[in-house]
Regions:
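Family-specific signature for flavin-dependent thymidylate synthase
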Residues: 1-268
C-alpha cells in the first residue's frame, strides 16, 4: 500500500465517522516543564496511559515551578508569587526536619554509638575520624592499655551491628515523612509525565484542548502535540484540532468567534 493509498483510505474512514481502526495506532509523548495543575486536567482524558514523576519517595531540595504569563508580566504579582513558592519550600524543609527528628527519637534510631558517629546522616567518614583520634596527629599515640583496645573493639562491633539497621530505618522513615510533607507543594509545582494515547483519543483530546477556551497551559501542550502528530501521520491528523476546524463551534454564546483563524491555523 502506497502512502497515497493509505491517505485516501484513512480519509474515507474518517469521512464516514468510522474511527475505530485508528485506535490501533498509538503515540507516546515525554513532557516536562509543566505544572501539576496541567496534569490534573490531563488525566481526565481516561483512555490513555500516564507515568508521572513521583513526589512520594524523593525529597526535593528546591522544587521548580511554572509561572503563569499573566503573573510573570506583572512585576508586583511576580514578586509575590515567587515569595509564595519560596515560603512553600521553606515550610516543606522545616516540617520535614521536625518530623524526621521526632520519628528518629521515637524509633530509637540514634543509639549509643550511632548518635555519636552521625549528627544527621550515617556517614562512615566520621567513624574513620574517631579512629584517627587514637593514632593520628603530629605525635601519634599508641593505645595505652587493653581497656582502650576493648573500647575500640566494642565500638566497631556496635557500629557494624547498628549502622545497617539504622540506615534501613532511617530510609523508611524518610519515605514516610515525605509522603506527608509533599501535601505542602502547590499546583504550580513543575513535573514530568509520559503520555501514551491512541490516535482516536488524541483527536478527541485536540477537539477539547486546542480550543481557545481551554486553559492556557494545557492548550499550549495540546497545540504542540497536534503539530508533532501532523508531521508524522498527516493522513490521520490532517484535520485535527478544535471542534470548529471541521464543523460548527459547540461553545455557543461562549465561542471565541475565530472559526476562520482556527481553520487556517490547524488545517493542513
Amino acid at each position: 500500500v502506497t502512502d497515497e493509498e493509505a491517505y485516501k483510505f484513512v480519509n474515507r474512514l474518517a469521512s464516514m465517522g468510522h474511527e475505530s481502526p485508528i485506535e490501533h495506532v498509538s503515540f507516546t509523548f515525554a513532557v516536562e516543564g509543566v505544572s501539576r495543575s496541567l496534569t490534573h486536567q490531563l488525566v481526565r482524558h481516561r483512555i490513555a496511559s500516564y507515568s508521572q514523576q513521583s513526589q512520594r519517595y524523593v525529597k526535593i531540595a528546591q522544587f521548580e515551578y511554572v509561572v503563569p504569563p499573566a503573573i510573570a508580566n506583572d512585576v508586583i504579582a511576580s514578586k509575590l508569587y515567587i515569595q509564595a513558592m519560596e515560603e512553600a519550600q521553606e515550610a516543606y524543609n522545616n516540617i520535614y526536619d521536625r518530623l524526621l527528628v521526632k520519628k528518629a527519637i521515637e524509633l530509637g534510631i540514634y543509639s549509643k554509638y550511632t548518635a555519636y558517629i552521625n549528627e544527621k546522616l550515617f556517614d562512615k567518614f566520621r567513624a574513620t575520624k574517631i579512629i584517627e583520634t587514637y593514632n593520628c596527629g603530629e605525635n601519634p599515640e599508641v593505645i595505652k592499655n587493653e581497656s582502650e583496645l576493648m573500647t575500640l573493639d566494642e565500638f566497631w562491633r556496635e557500629y557494624d551491628k547498628e549502622l545497617p539497621r539504622n540506615e534501613r530505618m532511617y530510609s523508611k522513615t524518610q519515605k514516610t515523612i515525605i509522603e506527608d510533607v509533599r501535601y505542602i507543594y502547590p499546583n504550580a509545582c513543575e513535573t514530568k509525565i509520559c503520555i501514551t494515547m491512541n490516535a482516536r483519543t488524541l483527536l478527541n483530546f485536540f477537539h477539547h484542548r486546542c480550543c481557545d477556551r481551554a486553559q492556557w497551559e494545557i492548550r499550549e501542550l495540546a497545540n504542540e502535540m497536534c503539530r508533532l502528530v501532523k508531521e508524522v501521520a498527516p493522513a490521520i491528523f490532517s484535520k485535527a484540532g478544535p471542534n470548529c476546524v471541521c464543523g460548527p463551534c459547540p461553545e455557543g454564546v461562549m465561542s471565541c468567534g475565530k472559526v476562520k483563524e482556527m481553520r487556517e491555523k490547524f488545517l493542513i
